[in-house]
């Protein structure tokens, strides 16, 4: 039976297990290399990575696969995922690969793949690569005269720094703003402080000392306790946390409170609408976006379009609907005028420009509407395939009937981790507890998400 290597966001797994190892990296390089060397021009692939210790091992295997297939390889070293998307376009590469497991801890790693246009590869293209990776003749190699070469891109960081700064209005500076950055000991640890410092901010940095094993460890966009404390201790204007690969953010206001992702989406959408910059009056988010966001956008004559969970699906729906703004409540924000993928640095610069334009604190800017209560639960499953899609669909249908018009229930498999995720959205807490109990009786033991 053919193995499925890809999830909802490329390939991801625990390093040196059957889910992710050097052999898989080599096969990926060989398979993708065969597909992206079609045509007569000299073919290039750009490879970036975050700061995980396994990145060296996987980079070497991936490089070997690509050069064996006849592609020249550009190596950037540690760099944010959106920088890989940008540089793939800028260097006229056929393909870009980011070695990362995003917000996961160092034991995991993976690959995100970008086409020559800077957008993540489609499901169809990933399926084509997956099929080649499963073939017995995957090791058929190019002629010795067609082997590719590899080189370092020494100015990769400086190229991305200038690209990100170009998204910030030329007439603005960040003078008089004190900002705390949490770089998650990840891919943004060099570029993020430099960008904000060059734009004039008083920058305080934590999570900027990666050692290969501390990426996302009690830091970053999913673990903001240290950043929230630092913002209060330093009396800062705000805090910004990035995840391990720099495509996702969390914002901490001047009071040390984390800004809800739905409020961030609403704030930016409102600003774009006021400036007549929001295309087709549409905002794209996911099925996880709060119902109160949809109601608020409707009240200002904007339409919320919901996509499946995952920033690549948000981007696909943005392109299909003609919208130039979308994102996930989890912190992936995409402004298509600036970037082809989620970019935490560029998104945070847009938040800062709004603060300066409106002369308001971030807490005032995001105080737009009350949220409907959402509770999130997770069931850890070593093999999600043990729980059938039909079982989850039937369970979801049953729970939706139970909650009726008082809210929403979403039960789904995570596309990047061995988890079944449950979201219950209602202000009726008794009903929420009843639904959780009912779900638990279906043989899913669901610990509360920390």
Language model: regions and residue ranges:
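An N-terminal, well-structured beta->alpha segment
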Residues: 1-64, 68-69, 153-177
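N-terminal small/polar loop signature for handling phosphorylated ligands or for N-terminal nucleophile
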Residues: 34, 38, 44-108, 194-252
